[in-house]
């Protein structure tokens, strides 16, 4: 959950408090400064009605100057570290669907980083350019014993331009166009899970959640031949990530 997700924190709060011991709670902030990060952390704790957040993450890192800012003396990570010392957060991470090279730099520069959230799916795995090389992020994180959370596993491409399909008419709430057929969802989950990620993150639209959970429950591995076959089939498809390529 994140403050930028509308009133999601307020809606989640009541059920979260009922089942707090059963839930690993991840939250994010787009603030890059010390003061801003503290302010948003306090807000999220209050809105969620909890005393601690299991994983608190820098949300949507995209540019080099942002990395410089969060790692500075007055940056967000200084606030994260204080909050961790005070028991308000248990772990600290960052998320990005931007340049893999930036995530690699973050892994090298932030010694106490505990998780990274980044895209991984057969479309980006099939691209030859470094700007799609999220597999390098997975490898570096594994070397450093940093947790890996895979997002955009179910991304099927970008939506048509808004003059062709207005946002209000999109059949799913995701900012990217998701795959929606049960067999496609199962195939995408199997691929992501087979990469050795710590966790595969669900898609954002509630209409897809049940199918993804069913795919997870039925997961029985995916061999190398099946992975390569899927990559070859979709490698020329459009990818909505890295995000900066679409600005």
Name every feature range the model reports, one short phrase each:
Residues 12-21, 42-51, 106-111, 139, ...:
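Acidic (Asp/Glu)-rich catalytic clusters
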Residues 45-68:
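Active-site groove signature of glycoside hydrolases
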Residues 1-23, 79, 85:
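N-terminal binding-site loop/beta-alpha segment at the start of enzyme catalytic domains
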Residues 32-40:
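Glycine-rich anion/phosphate-binding loops
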Residues 7, 61-247:
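Beta/alpha (TIM)-barrel catalytic core signal, keyed to glycine-rich beta->alpha loops juxtaposed to Asp/Glu
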Residues 22-33, 55-60, 119-122:
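A short, structured active-site edge motif that brings together acidic residues
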């Amino acid at each position: 959950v994140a403050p930028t997700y509308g009133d999601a924190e307020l809606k989640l709060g009541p059920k979260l408090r009922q089942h707090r011991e059963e839930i690993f709670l991840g939250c994010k902030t787009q603030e890059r400064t010390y003061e801003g990060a503290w302010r948003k952390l306090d807000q999220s704790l209050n809105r969620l009605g909890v005393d601690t957040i299991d994983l608190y993450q820098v949300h949507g890192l995209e540019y080099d100057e942002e990395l410089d800012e969060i790692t500075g003396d007055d940056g967000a990570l200084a606030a994260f570290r204080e909050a961790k010392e005070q028991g308000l957060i248990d772990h600290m991470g960052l998320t990005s669907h931007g340049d893999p090279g930036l995530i690699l730099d973050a892994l090298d520069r932030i010694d106490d980083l505990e998780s990274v959230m980044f895209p991984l799916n057969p479309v980006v795995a099939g691209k030859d350019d470094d700007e799609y090389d999220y597999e390098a992020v997975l490898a570096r994180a594994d070397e450093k014993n940093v947790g890996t959370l895979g997002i955009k596993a179910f991304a099927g491409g970008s939506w048509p331009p808004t003059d062709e399909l207005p946002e209000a008419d999109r059949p799913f709430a995701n900012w990217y166009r998701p795959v929606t057929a049960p067999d496609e969802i199962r195939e995408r989950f199997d691929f992501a899970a087979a990469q050795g990620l710590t966790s595969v993150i669900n898609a954002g639209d509630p209409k897809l959640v049940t199918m993804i959970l069913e795919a997870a429950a039925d997961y029985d591995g995916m061999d190398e031949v099946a992975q390569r076959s899927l990559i070859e089939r979709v490698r020329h498809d459009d990818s909505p990530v890295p995000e900066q390529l679409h600005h």
